[in-house]
Amino acid sequence: HIALPDFSSGAMENWGPMTYRETAMLANAKSSLSSKRQIALVIAHETAHQWFGNLVTMRWWDDLWLNESFATMMEYLAADSFYPDWNIWEEFAVNEAILSLRRDAIDGVQSVHIPVHHPDEIGTIFDGAIVYAKGARLMNMLRNYVGEEAFKSGLANYFEKFAYQNTVGDDLWRALSAASGKDVASFMESWLKQPGYPVVEADYDNGKLKLSQSQFFIGEGKNKKRVWPILLNANNPNIPKILDEKSIMVEL
């Protein structure tokens, strides 16, 4: 890790010596806790790229999320393991998330996975609110969906199999599916390839619960046909684990 006094980027995950702007890496006894937290997150993010991006690299830029979404999630995992008293996951729930939710609720926003047809388009896809912030929270949702042990095992197998190679998202899905026994590709497809996010409405009447999903949207242009597989947590066995239809009716 090398701190540079004059560096245009905040940090860069070079394959070997990672470089940082001094303010993104250096702290002292007088530094505020918020500065130390930010430095820890940046260092963890760039270190995560040694696996997500360097050891295994996406085949083409439409899978940029393989690098950035995972590295953004891993920065919080790493910081929490070193400094559990920081309660960094509380920050994960709000830091950048509000920006992402606002950005993702308007027309014209890109999806996490977006086709790139020409090198001139590459610079336009580095959307911090979507590929980084939203993508990281989707990866954390996936971690909860497959389970911690299956997630770790699947990643270990993925890195071992594809070390020093290029991959696509489906390669990772197959590794996580093999480790968890779940169809990860089907679960993640609409989350990655559709812009926006859903809101769930619950209506209860005479012992019946109706759950309906629709896209949360601000303004005109709402797509009423979009559906996401939404994880549900409930103490009633009649309520399914996943809502993957526009609406369902449940007897309680």
Task: Give the positions of each predicted feature.
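Hydrophobic alpha-helical and helix-loop surface patches within well-folded domains
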Residues: 1-221
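Long, His/Glu/Asp-enriched segments that create or flank divalent metal/ion-associated functional microenvironments
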Residues: 199-252
